[in-house]
Amino acid sequence: MNKGFALNNQNMSGPIFSDDSVERELELLKSEANLVKWQAPNGEMFTMTLPHTVYPPREDTFFLAKCLLKLGPGKGRRCLEIGTGSGVLSLMCHRQGWRVSACDINPMAIASAKNMLLNNQADDVIIREGGPGPSSDGDVQQWSGSEKYDLIFWNMPYVRINEFDSHLGPMEEAALTDTSSQGLVSLTLMQINTSNILKSSGVGLLTVGEHFDLDELLSICAE
C-alpha cells in the first residue's frame, strides 16, 4: 500500500499531506523515541525502541501473533510479512524457525525493524521498502522479492480515523487507512495471486476490519 502525493484523483494511491501534516510529521521525528515492551502469546518478551511515527504492538498484533503460533514451527519455511511496522512479528517468526522477509512503506518503520532485528541476532531477515498498491507504484517483486512463500501475513489497515492515537504521525496514519478504490483486501489478494508469490500449499493471514462480514470475505477470496 504505497502512500504518497498524486497529480489527480484517478492516480491517487493515498491521502495528500497538508502543510500542517508535514509539519506535525517533522515535529514527531524530532521527539524522543519510546521504549516499548511487548509480550507474545507464548510468553516471550520483546523490547524495542520506536519513534513516534511507527505503529507499536497492540491488541491486533497479539491476535495475529496467536494465529501465527498456531501454524507451528517454521522449520525453514519462507514467510513474508507485509507492513512489518515495529518488526516484532517478523522477529517472533524468525525465532520460530521461519526464513523471514518483510516490507513496509514507512522508511522509519524499516529502520526501526532493522535495528531491532540486528540487536536480536536476526539480521538475516530481509526487509524491503514498499507494499501492495497501484502498478504505477512499482511491481510486486519490489516489495516481495523473487521468492515463493509458504506464508504471507499482514495486519492490514482498518483503524477508523477517529481512533488514531497521538503516538502516530501522518505518515503512519496514512499507512493505517484503506484508500484503495477497489478495496485493499481485494487488491492485495489479487496481487498475491497474479504474482504467484504464495505457494499452492501456502497460507495467507490478513486481519480485516469489523465492517466486513463472512459472506463478503468469502466472495473476495473466491474471486
Predicted regions and their residues:
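N-terminal amphipathic/basic-hydrophobic helices that include classical n-h-c signal peptides
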Residues: M1-G4
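SAM-dependent Rossmann-like transferase core, predominantly class I methyltransferases
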Residues: N9, G14-Q96, I110-S112, P134-D139
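Short alpha-helical
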Residues: P56, V88, P107-M108, V185, ...
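A general structural signal for well-ordered alpha-helical segments in protein cores
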Residues: T61, S86, S166-E173, L187-Q191, ...
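Conserved SAM/SAH cofactor-binding pocket of Class I
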Residues: A65-S166, L189
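Glycine-rich, phosphate-binding/catalytic loops in enzymes
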Residues: Q96, L168-E172, A222
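Mobile active-site "lid"/loop adjacent to the S-adenosyl-L-methionine
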Residues: M156-S186
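Conserved Class I SAM-dependent methyltransferase catalytic core
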Residues: G183-E223
